[in-house]
Amino acid sequence: MKKILLGIFITIFFAGGALAERYVMVTHTAGTDPFWPVVQKGGEDAAKAIGADFEYMFHPSGDMAEMAKLIVAATATQPDGMVVSLPDPDALGPAIQDAVAAGLSLIHI
C-alpha cells in the first residue's frame, strides 16, 4: 500500500513538468482514522524523494467549514500543488474552485 501511495504522489508531483518545491495536503480526518496517517506518510515520503517540502493539514473537529478554511489558508501560501480529500463537494467546492482559479495544481482524493 505504501509503495502504491508513494508512486501516486511521485506521479502527481512530476506531472507539472517541473521539480516542485512545496506541497500541501488537506484531509477531513478528525485525527482518529488509521487510514490518514498512511496517506500522510505517503505524501511525506514522496516529497522527500523529490526534495520537496510537504505540509499535512486537517481540522481536529472534522468540520467541513473548518476544512474549507484550511483550503483557503493553504491556497494563500501558493504551494506548488495541493491534494484535498473531498467528503462534501457542496461545502468544499467553492474553496477548491478558488484554489484552481488561483492557478494551483490540485487533485482531490
Sequence positions of predicted segments:
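Bacterial N-terminal signal peptides
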Residues: 7-15
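A residue-level marker of the well-folded mature domains of exported/periplasmic proteins
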Residues: 3-5, 18-107
